[in-house]
Every structure is written in structure tokens, then in C-alpha cells.
């Protein structure tokens, strides 16, 4: 009864349990301040709970558009970025999608779930994309998916390499989920390249992983097409109210981003050659230390495949010092 393709899938798993430090999901270490929560509750008081939310999430789209200086028609909002990825893999003409492993696995997941083949163009040794090879593979592709900063390696992709792919005219989805921590983005290319889709989220820099709100910035043509196939009413009234409120307080989040970046660099210096440079809110660490850390109540992300023997570590606050102390112990055990 169940499709063979579904039987072949491995469900997305995370570690659960009574651990003391969680550095595995790239969440913000900062909750919303009490006064912002109160503002959200006030916003919700005027919203009827017995009615469906706006069918295309227009209140949130307008707030995001105003924040970036874009019309709401250039914005799509989803129940997390994953929902939008699920539509984007199906939206464009072509024989397959192109991905650049090691990278975020949900591009391939949703493509294969929908019977769409996946062509992989691996990252170079320095984890940058090979724009020439991707452009060649893109000729028959429906879309190319590039994460910048890349998850799990943490690096921004060179603009000149992304441009090589954009010049093909094929749909290019650049996942900028962590871009606020990088200080550089591709927003300025939207007018020049109508085939560009920027995918972003409120889960990281805006401390809203629990609200599940992702969004896409793209040409009006792409956004209109996306809403032709998108489930109606998918972004609830709570999520839309939260978006409107947090975007009224950009200064708070800019300061938090600066603090996370400062901590990232401090932790990276402490780890020395074990840590790769990062433009995100996490570090890729060359250390087979997952089990060692777990035994000490510290949860990090264990990596596999090309990154076997590596871990991905979210930048926290005071948790960072406990992690660094445990890593010093691990280095002693490992003889480093």
C-alpha cells in the first residue's frame, strides 16, 4: 500500500532526551524579550480566532516587503522554509534539480519525494561551488539549489560563482537562511535576475524557530506561480502576528546578531585549527567528538558522508564555555 519511494526514505531525526546543553539545531540562543511577547499578545487581541488567516498571508508579506523595500507581490511566506522548498522543487520546467553537497538535505528530500531526479555537483575542497560545472548541468535542470551560507559548512558562496549559474537563465534558489550572520547577501541581484529566488527564515537571526515562518523573495512572476500551487491558509494568525511585531524592532536583532558573530569568532579562535571559518551562527568542527560530548550532556550535530568525523556546533551563550571545556578534555583523550 505504501509507495516504495516512501519506504526508502529515512525520517528526519534529532536527538531527544534530558541533556543539559543543546547546540545541534542552529537555533538562536536568545528568546524574545517579555515586552515583545506582550506586544505579540496585544496584536493577537484584534485578530478573530474563529476565522481563517489571510489566504496568501498578505499581512506578513506586506510587513516583510516593507522591511526590505519590496512590494508584497515579491514575497511569499510559508510554514517554515521547508514548505516553500517543497513547492520550489516542483515549480519550474526541467528534467531534474541540481544540488551541491554537502549541503542542506531537504532540497533532495522534497525532489525525490515528488519523483524528481537530483543531479549533484559536489562542493570543491574549500566548500565553494563550482559555477562552471553547475551551469553546464543546469541546461536541462528545472532549478539549482545553492545554500549561502552553506549548511553545514558555514561559508558564503562566491558571488562570481553564483552569477555564472544565474546567467544560464534557469531558476536559481539561493537559500540565505543564515545570511544575517554573514553581512553580505544577494538582495541587490533580484532586479537584474528574474530567475533568482532568495529563501530566508525567521528561525535563526530572529529567534523564531518555534513559530515556523520562512519566506521567499523573487520576481512577481515566480511568486504568483508559487501561490497557484501553494496550500491556502498555511501560515497561521500567530505566526503572522509574530512577524509583524519582530520587524518593528530591527535594532534588537541587529545587536543580537553582532553578539552571536563575536561569540562565533571567539569560539573559533579557541578551537584553533579544528574549526573552519564560518559566516553563519554555527561552526563546522573537524572532531569525531559527538559521542564524547553527548556523554557529558552536550548535544551537537553529527555529520556523515564526506564530512564523517566532523560535528556542527551552534553558537550559544554561556553554553559555549562548557562546550569548549569539554573539547579540551576530548583533545587530551584524542592525543591532540
Curated annotation (Swiss-Prot):
Cited InterPro entries: Aminotrans_II_pyridoxalP_BS, Aminotransferase_I/II_large, HisP_aminotrans, PyrdxlP-dep_Trfase, PyrdxlP-dep_Trfase_major, PyrdxlP-dep_Trfase_small
EC category name: transferase
Cited CDD domains: AAT_like
SUPFAM superfamilies: PLP-dependent transferases
Presence of keyword Lipid biosynthesis: no
Cross-referenced Gene3D superfamilies: Aspartate Aminotransferase, domain 1 (3.90.1150.10), Type I PLP-dependent aspartate aminotransferase-like (Major domain) (3.40.640.10)
Any GO MF annotation of the entry: histidinol-phosphate transaminase activity
Pathway where this protein functions: Amino-acid biosynthesis; L-histidine biosynthesis; L-histidine from 5-phospho-alpha-D-ribose 1-diphosphate: step 7/9
Biological process, per Gene Ontology: L-histidine biosynthetic process
Modified residues (N6-(pyridoxal phosphate)lysine): 204
Enzyme Commission no: 2.6.1.9
Cofactor(s) named in the record: pyridoxal 5'-phosphate
Alphabetized UniProt keyword annotations: Amino-acid biosynthesis, Aminotransferase, Histidine biosynthesis, Pyridoxal phosphate, Transferase
Catalytic activity: L-histidinol phosphate + 2-oxoglutarate = 3-(imidazol-4-yl)-2-oxopropyl phosphate + L-glutamate
Signal peptide start-end: none
Family assignment from sequence similarity: Belongs to the class-II pyridoxal-phosphate-dependent aminotransferase family. Histidinol-phosphate aminotransferase subfamily.
Protein's name according to its UniProt entry: Histidinol-phosphate aminotransferase
